[in-house]
């Protein structure tokens, strides 16, 4: 049996940095990444056979817990009939219909294979439909790794302390206006200066890639009003929050309806599925109907769609989100109470099945505030919890995720471990 360290050393010889997505490398927390061999329910097991309670959840998709038997069965049954056809299937139509039925802002939707594809194409669609070039995004919000969006981004870029990426020509981001999240006045000023040039505003309606930052009261409604007034397209990037925070995503919780929505993660049930959709008049600009090009060999892949359909059916059961939200809130509140009892500066927040942990005196409301949190304290907390069998994201700038299988016993075990760790942090 190989150890995690041996596997990481081997991986580094053939894969850049030893990983296929940078945050997995543990660079921001130090130490050796855990190589996962299997997962079931709320647990993962590493290459050395150690079991962990998992709050990474494949970075969001595992809302039902890992390897849910009905999802696994759906994948197996689909795979028997073929892995990929490069042609339309009834299943992809069914998934599209299901997404439209669940999200009132969707009139039409197209399936892709990732969140990056979804956001990249939504931006292209907004530009093509409006004939404008400039876009507004927000500092710390991550919308995938397409060139024009790698400006003051969150997720891996924030983890590594890089506000943008090498290899992106200045011309590619010349039309991107990065503004402060939750600062509606800055958006108003940008529209006052560039209104006739702005194609769209893209936003994580709850930011989950600079830890968890909720929208300020009136922020999303204000974006809706400004986009309507200036003829710009409002895009909600619900790749992370879609069907994770509630049955209709953030737009269902707030009542703010975007023009376009991007989705991924949960809708694939752990398989590579993304989607973008919205107003039919906008979607009519996508090929083969219009002149905005988009294509994909594996878009609507039948095996991935089978996982998505099974997941979407299960999360649609009555009471699902009430139970998920209650467990997530219990975890966040329990962690905050134990930190406070230990005298450790710490805050926690939650929405639906997502939570944020911050080593600071209050819950941050912006990129600047989350950047000021104590990352060294987080590193100590992360490793001490990992030693006790609790698997949090290896970055102070990533949200955490609870699944339907995180029952009271799992939450209690997590809080017991955290109580021990907070006592050591105080010392």
Swiss-Prot record:
This is Glutamate-1-semialdehyde 2,1-aminomutase. The keyword ATP-binding does not apply. Pathway: Porphyrin-containing compound metabolism; protoporphyrin-IX biosynthesis; 5-aminolevulinate from L-glutamyl-tRNA(Glu): step 2/2. The modification N6-(pyridoxal phosphate)lysine is found at residue 265. It comes from Bordetella parapertussis (strain 12822 / ATCC BAA-587 / NCTC 13253). Its cofactor is pyridoxal 5'-phosphate. Homodimer. SUPFAM superfamilies: PLP-dependent transferases. Its main location: cytoplasm. It catalyses: (S)-4-amino-5-oxopentanoate = 5-aminolevulinate. Belongs to the class-III pyridoxal-phosphate-dependent aminotransferase family. HemL subfamily. GO terms for biological process: protoporphyrinogen IX biosynthetic process. Its EC number is 5.4.3.8. GO terms for molecular function: glutamate-1-semialdehyde 2,1-aminomutase activity; pyridoxal phosphate binding; transaminase activity. It is found in: Cytoplasm. Keywords: Cytoplasm, Isomerase, Porphyrin biosynthesis, Pyridoxal phosphate. It holds the Pfam family Aminotran_3. One of its GO terms (cellular component) is cytoplasm.
